[in-house]
Amino acid sequence: MTLSILYAASSPSWEEYEAPLTAALGATGLRYRLGPDLPAAEVDYIVYAPDSDVQDFSRFPRLKAVLNLWAGVERVVGNPTLRVPLARMVDDEGLTQGMVEYVTGHVLRHHLGMDAHIVNPDHAWHHEAPPLSRDRPVTVLGLGALGTACARALSALGFPVTGWSRTAKQIDGLRCLHGTDQLGTALDGAQILILLLPDTAATTDILDAAALARLAPGAFVINPGRGPLIDDGALLAALDSGRVAHATLDVFRTEPLPRDHAYWAHPGVTITPHIASETRAGSAARVVADNIRRSEAGEPLRHLVDRAAGY
């Protein structure tokens, strides 16, 4: 049987993915046809991004699974017409490695105090050595694929890393805490906080005034996860008071970030335009193709979304 695989995404574009998907699917040995315009009645799989025009999945009677090209699924997971398995993108070659590089780079930037040397209009000679990594406690909120990879990379550099997640995890070399009762403990005394949680009702404003108050004075906050994780007003107040020394933010409630947003003008905020990590077409295509192969072989799909949890 020839499978029909619909490409339904505005970003990334079909032009970017046509060749990598064709190559990856060809390597599986499956018979297939692939494209952005296929009859709904014949579609077996959808390679998807939530910005697609496809929002009514009930139009696809043969649909077996939806393979998301984005790591985040908050814009599709609650779709009542989606009644087949939904797999999120976990791309160790591209997405994960990119996040590790972004997080590690900004952790080292703040740990080493590089901003004082990069921006030094007074030409001051700041002869003050930074502490060693072993003396800089780091907390990572979120121990999914991205959070775990970042936590392991920082631990390998000598940072004492605490990881927190909704459910219990055991990861060699890390102090792992979980559940609402242990969130405060995970935050207590952290000098660098990294947010890599999904966007769910339970994580909205998880970094509020009470949470910020538990960090070490002069802490650094890095958010490459999701914009709604942060209570923006509380973070700005913490920056103004010095409770937080600096925040590096890659994601926001509204994107692009409005030009009049207070973050732009704040000297304690670094803004990057949602570039912490990108799905790479070549490696992502291999992830998608492997999941289709697994489905056709009767094997469980990888990276299935838990609808109840929202990620």
Residue ranges and their predicted role:
Residues M1-D44:
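N-terminal glycine-/charge-rich "phosphate-binding" loop or analogous flexible N-terminal tail
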Residues D44-I118:
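Phosphate/diphosphate ligand-binding glycine-rich loop within oxidoreductases
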Residues G105-A129, G282-S283, V287-V288, R294:
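A charged, well-structured terminal subsegment
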Residues R88-M99, A116-H117, Q170, E255-Y311:
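C-terminal helix-to-coil terminal segments
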Residues H117-A149:
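Glycine-rich NAD(P)-binding loop of Rossmann-like domains
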Residues R31-E42, V54-D56, G173-G189:
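Short acidic low-complexity segments
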Residues A168-A262:
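Rossmann-like adenosine-cofactor binding region
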Residues L157-G173:
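NAD(P)-binding Rossmann-fold cofactor-contacting core
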